[in-house]
Regions:
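A detector of low-complexity, intrinsically disordered, Ser/Thr/Gly/Pro/Ala-rich segments
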Residues: 18-20, 38, 80
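Intrinsically disordered, glycine/charged-rich N-terminal periplasmic/extracytoplasmic linker segments
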Residues: 51-115
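Extracellular/mature segments of secreted proteins
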Residues: 25-27, 35-58, 62
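Bacterial Sec signal peptide processing site at the extreme N-terminus
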Residues: 17-33
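Amphipathic alpha-helical repeat scaffolds
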Residues: 33-34, 73
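Classical Sec-dependent N-terminal signal peptides that target proteins to the secretory pathway
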Residues: 1-22
Length: 115
């Protein structure tokens, strides 16, 4: 019984830590959105935010993230999508990134879709 209780507590702490990390990332993303209303001006802010929360995973994620931000910005600059659509696309990409099992492959596929 004690082992089950201990495992339950550890599991809850782990889930809480993951949820807290996601919440902090989303809060920082919203701060970037408030400071830089235009997605195209928020590239450095979003990049630093991503790097802060995913740096322990892989430097390759950071490079791919930068390519994705630039691709979304290019679509906005060329009037293929609006600023609001750019923010929504970014939010969906990050949400799906968090839930994907093969994160590198997911980011690579996103890059190809955005081109």
């Amino acid at each position: 019984m004690k082992k089950v209780s201990f495992l339950l507590i550890i599991s809850l702490l782990f889930l809480n830590a993951c949820a807290t990390k996601t919440k902090k990332f989303n809060t920082q993303k919203e701060n970037c959105k408030e400071i830089y209303v235009y997605f195209t001006q928020s590239k450095n802010c979003l990049g630093l935010n991503f790097q802060t929360y995913y740096e322990e995973k892989n430097r390759e994620y950071e490079k791919q993230h930068d390519v994705i931000i630039n691709a979304i910005s290019n679509k906005i600059f060329s009037n293929n999508i609006t600023n609001d659509q750019g923010w929504k696309n970014y939010e969906n990409i990050i949400k799906d990134f968090r839930s994907s099992k093969d994160k590198t492959n997911y980011l690579t596929n996103v890059i190809y879709r955005l081109d």
